[in-house]
């Protein structure tokens, strides 16, 4: 059974909640919602959140000001029974999720990660081994162009895709490995192309799927 249709205001709040989770890693407070939408009182935000909960879009958790959980549509989940696309080697200059890069589908629900995983990327090399991301592992990735300092990102630098920890410092972007034998990649976006393709939201160990 499909979920009930949202009003324009409810859709605006739902989209803001999702965007806030994607960009900060946590749901917004009622005060933050009220400020963003233009409500005079957090109580107005609370009433709209209750409506979203009744319609099956979110779950409200008691005892915390950020107690909002996005719910997965059962029909959307059923439409993705094949699981998450598994991305292998990415050819230079092509979109990371181009059909030719999809080696298979891995039977895992993207909603088990927070935020949701959109695809799995096969890790090549040990540049992130100090934080347990090893050669051959499957990195669960949430597709987004926004990332904060300290997050592990999938980045495209010129024509190469790499997994590193992000640091923005002044005009430069540093992509740090988690391996003492390697040096960071330093990018000046004024003269070099760089794009954030997604953020890491989990790891599936290589011996768990081989």
UniProtKB/Swiss-Prot annotation:
DNA-binding region: 30-50
Keyword Transmembrane helix attributed: no
Record's catalysed reaction(s): Hydrolysis of Ala-|-Gly bond in repressor LexA
UniProt GO molecular function: DNA binding; serine-type endopeptidase activity
Keywords (A to Z) from UniProt: Autocatalytic cleavage, DNA damage, DNA repair, DNA replication, DNA-binding, Hydrolase, Repressor, SOS response, Transcription, Transcription regulation
GO biological process: DNA repair; DNA replication; negative regulation of DNA-templated transcription; proteolysis; SOS response
Broad class of enzyme this protein falls into: hydrolase
Cysteine pairs bridged by disulfides in the record: none
Transmembrane segments: none
Gene3D superfamilies xrefs: Umud Fragment, subunit A, Winged helix-like DNA-binding domain superfamily/Winged helix DNA-binding domain
Site (Cleavage): 92-93
Domain of life assignment: Bacteria
Keyword DNA-binding: yes
Function in brief: Represses a number of genes involved in the response to DNA damage (SOS response), including recA and lexA. In the presence of single-stranded DNA, RecA interacts with LexA causing an autocatalytic cleavage which disrupts the DNA-binding part of LexA, leading to derepression of the SOS regulon and eventually DNA repair.
Family: Belongs to the peptidase S24 family.
Name the record gives this protein: LexA repressor
Lineage start: Bacteria, Pseudomonadati, Pseudomonadota, Gammaproteobacteria, Pasteurellales
């Amino acid at each position: 059974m499909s979920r009930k249709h949202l009003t324009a205001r409810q859709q605006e709040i739902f989209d803001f909640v999702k965007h806030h989770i994607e960009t900060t890693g946590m749901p917004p407070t009622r005060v933050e919602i009220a400020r963003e939408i233009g409500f005079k009182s957090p109580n107005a935000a609370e009433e709209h959140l209750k409506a979203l909960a009744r319609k099956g879009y979110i779950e409200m958790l008691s005892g915390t000001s950020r107690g909002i959980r996005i719910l997965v549509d059962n029909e959307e989940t059923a439409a993705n029974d094949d699981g998450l696309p598994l991305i292998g080697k990415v050819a230079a200059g092509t979109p990371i999720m181009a059909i030719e890069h999809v080696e298979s589908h891995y039977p895992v629900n993207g909603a088990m990660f927070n935020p949701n995983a959109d695809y799995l990327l096969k890790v090549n090399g040990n540049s992130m081994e100090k934080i347990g991301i090893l050669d051959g592992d499957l990195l669960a990735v949430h597709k987004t162009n926004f990332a904060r300092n300290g997050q592990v990102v999938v980045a495209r630098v010129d024509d190469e895709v790499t997994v590193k920890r992000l640091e923005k410092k002044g005009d430069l972007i540093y992509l740090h490995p988690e391996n003492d034998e390697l040096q960071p990649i330093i990018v000046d976006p004024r003269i070099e192309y760089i794009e954030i393709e997604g953020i890491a939201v989990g790891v599936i160990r290589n011996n768990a799927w081989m």
